[in-house]
Amino acid sequence: MPPKKSNARNASLLKEAVTNAGRSDTASTAREGSIAATFVSDSDSSTTASGPVDEKVAAVAELITTLTTNAASDKRQSAADDIAKFVEAEGVAQMVKTKILHGIATGLHNTKQPVAREGAITAIETLIKSPVSKQIEPYMITFIPVLLERLSDKAKTVCLAADSALKALITRLTPYATKQVLPLLLAGIEYSQKWQTKVGALELMQSLSKTAPRQMTTAVPDLVPPLSEVMHDTKAEAKNAGRQTMEAICELINNKDIEKFIPALIDTIANPEKVPDTVHLLGATTFVSEVLPPTLAIMVPLLSRGLNERQTAIKRKAAVIIINMCKLVEKPQIIAPFLPRLLPTLEKIQDDVADPECRQVCQNATKILTKVGIPAPGTVMDDSYEFKKLDDKALAYLKKAIGHQQITEIPEAYRPVLEYLEHIAAAMVADGNMDNDDWNGSIIPTLKAFIPTEGTVTNAVKEFRELSFGSNVKEAVAEEEEDDAEELCNCEFSLAYGARVLLNRTHLILKRGHRYGLTGANGSGKSTLMRAIANGQVEGFPPADQLKTVAVEHDLDGAHEHDNKEVQAFVLEDPVYAHLPKETVVNMLESVGFKGPMATRPVGQLSGGWRMKLALARAMLHNADILLLDEPTNHLDVINVAWLQDYLIGLKTVTSIIVSHDSSFLDIVCSDIIHLDNFKLKRYRGNLSKFVEAVPEAKAYYELGAAQQTFRFPEPGMLEGVKTKERAILKVQNAVFQYPGTDRRQLNGVTFQCSLGSRVAVVGPNGAGKSTLIKLLCGVIEPDNGVVWRHPNLRIAYVAQHAFEHIEKHTNLTPNQYIQWRYQTGEDREEMEKAARQISAEEEAAMKKVQVISGEKKVVDSVIGRRKLKNSYEYEVSWVGKLSNENSWLPRDTLIEMGFLKKVQEIDQAEAARQGLARPLTQKEIEKHLSDVGIDSEIGTHSHIRGLSGGQKVKVVIAGAMWQRPHLLVLDEPTNFLDRDSLGALKTAIDAYGGGVIMVTHSREFSEAICKEVWKVDNGELTPTGHNWVSGQGSGPRLEDKNKDEEVFDAFGNKIDVAKQKSKLSGKDLRKKRKEREARRKRGEEVSDDDE
């Protein structure tokens, strides 16, 4: 809650009024520092001199006497009218000198004579309604505290008069004077013991909400706390008025996200037991509007109470609302006053609550509150809702104008005018209002009493306005560079995706021929913004008939429907290009490399790089004004990347917006960088290197090691017989593979091996066979010829080039649910779907052959399990028509010769999976695993996969693959979709990972930072360099099992007690044991067989 703003002066004025209500007339007249004395200058001795002034003083004194003593109301009104006419004719200076205000104040404080009080109030109301009301408004404001007290006067007529006068003043009040009046009204609520005074002050606030809505809106943070207290007042009238005023004030809050919940928010203030229901209600809200102090003022009481609820779910949801709202706060000064209500409670929850997820959410809320609400060192806090002292030069000028050159000491009688104009000017400066008409309308009516000449007073206000702004001028929007490029777009918009806000009231300006690099973290909304532009969903963006915008995304939409069509026919038969001459289409296809056989190749046989080229060619046939390129270098080799760079730079009349994590590509191509951060788009002139100079935290674009994120991969388990990281755990010899229906081999006699220490980069041009090689290594495909050997317990994690294929059938699940589905049977369900696991018809027939075992003919029913046999394994086999006690154990080689290779591999994979899945498949364990690859619990457990960004989906795929603690991690184009910070985190995780890593990538920067070994693939042949292949264990350091002390769990989270293996005794120990047994026998002790 912001601190109460009722200053000491306002409180003392009210207390003074209350105290003086019981004094005698003489005492109230003589008191020093009273309200009446305010209007008498210490140097005003000239009023006693003889002459015209004496006559005016006498005439005014007679009117004051009639006003405060005459019992007839019409006589008192007549006297009040004459006083108003006198002030109108003679001006403010004569009003002060003739002590009119002094006389009114004296009558107002006359506690013995109701007629005096009523007459004084009549004069006040008459002056307020007179033509000179604006000139004397500063003085009328000073009567507010006493008039509020007169609302509870014993004389009913005085109460009614005070009520009428206050309403007349408030309805005519200059709007920008609201900031000066509100503390006086708040004092009436907070310090008065009379309910009539409270109700009156509350009703005046309601009036102000109609006459000065803009000014009252900025004051909402000051008003909500005291109004909340009044809503619990013991007096029903005050309580009801407080509720009505709160409703009137909250109607001013301009936030479409919460406006329908405002009645419920007010209800929770009056009825705290409704807090849980309201928190649930707001927890399902998508926040897209900018959050300002008025919104926080009504939300923070609910959130504070929500954090203090007993239910953990309510605490968590309140913290989530805080996170979502903080993302829409632009400046620290907006939220800083509310931090004391939220931060201590959030920090306490982190220490006290048992639920780790709730603690994590509260920790995240604390971080974002601290980041948003506590400014960086050197930042100047600018609270627009506090009264700010004017610039000294402006104040000096104002004193000069009012005091007629008496700059050093202005007459005390004019002090109310000075304070009034200072408040108005400060309020207009805080509002950023430099409009001449507003300044003239607010200040000239009062200032012209001191500068009567119209031209002079107008110039004075102009100079005063300029001096008032002084150093408080708000930061102007940076001007666009001065060039002659045509402006294609200039719009302000917000953007949300599902329940997540991506951009909030941000500007987008695009110019013809510029090439904009769109940067930002994964999940910040880059691809969503591109799609929104392409689909015409950006508010204010020119429509398609005015501006041709074409999107080039990372794959061909609907390409699966046309897999069998030839490339050239695929484009020519598309209705979109029917109006183009065939020659134009053919030339465009040839320009990106589709010549000769490539032009007639089926779309389904194109590699990822060729698919991207086809997408680019199709986009360029549109003759677009704006090209939207989302990761255009994905799947492109170095030659094609260079071609794309040259092509884009050569488009002098076409604007490009590019999302790419290829730093060298952005450096060469971009003329500008548009950075997406904190829900805003900010443009930086120059290429990526210039951007990094301006934003040092973006250093990760150049240095992968500078990443702020960190990933961590689980350590792989031990493999039997593997003592060092150099020993081969996978070997391929002379493997040959050719896709059916193709005219050449994709792999031709390739030989390689992998170990736990492998760090391999697979490189080569598009279509050379890199992805095919990886699929062979992982068992997705089997070779037509050659030998593939994998360690029987080897676990391989594979992230495909089109990583989304792993999760495309599970987009309605959360990442947490996806991992639970994938491993719920104890095995990797994706692994079971691989081609290497599927049994062909020929293999099925071979397995049904009759086998002769120990002279008996038998048919294999199934392979059940395995056990160790010297340096290999033997497998338990059940037979058709035989009981289980007749099962046999056959060596591995025997079963393979019988045609049961895939069944043997199935048992091996199941055993390997069992060893790798020794961890509980529970929500909490999976959340921890997901957090190790940069997916927090809010996304991992509470967001569906379909709502995630491309980079977040890739992280989910990596997490899913790493759950089984693999020995080999295979990444096909890992740099696709991941932002630079995530790539740096991935590099760090790979460096620390205890297993082998094989990756296909065109990113030389990424591969060189990680890989020592390079496999160059070209025309289906493999040329390895930098490898260290050994035939045995090698000479490296011996491995230690880092997971040996970890507890083992089944898939349901139940702990498994693992018996420790007994170490084999040496010969010396065995001989010692025998001697001990013989000695025990000689002593007559029994020695069991177990002891033997």
UniProtKB/Swiss-Prot annotation:
A GO cellular component entry from the record: cytosol
EC number: 3.6.4.-
Region of interest (Disordered), ranges: 1023-1044, 1063-1092
Pfam families named among the record's database cross-references: ABC_tran, HEAT_EF3_GNC1, HEAT_EF3_N
Reaction(s) catalysed (UniProt annotation): ATP + H2O = ADP + phosphate + H(+)
GO molecular function: ATP binding; ATP hydrolysis activity; RNA binding; translation elongation factor activity
BP term (GO), one: regulation of biosynthetic process
Biased composition (Basic residues): 1063-1075
Residue windows of the HEAT repeats: 95-133, 138-175, 177-214, 218-255, 257-293, 294-331, 333-370
Compartments it resides in: Cytoplasm, Cytosol
PROSITE patterns hit by this protein: ABC_TRANSPORTER_1, ABC_TRANSPORTER_2, HEAT_REPEAT
UniProt keywords, alphabetically: ATP-binding, Cytoplasm, Elongation factor, Hydrolase, Nucleotide-binding, Protein biosynthesis, Repeat, RNA-binding
SUPFAM superfamilies (UniProt xref): ARM repeat, Chromo domain-like, P-loop containing nucleoside triphosphate hydrolases
Extent of Basic and acidic residues compositional bias: 1076-1086
Similarity comment text for this entry: Belongs to the ABC transporter superfamily. ABCF family. EF3 subfamily.
Protein's name in the database: Elongation factor 3
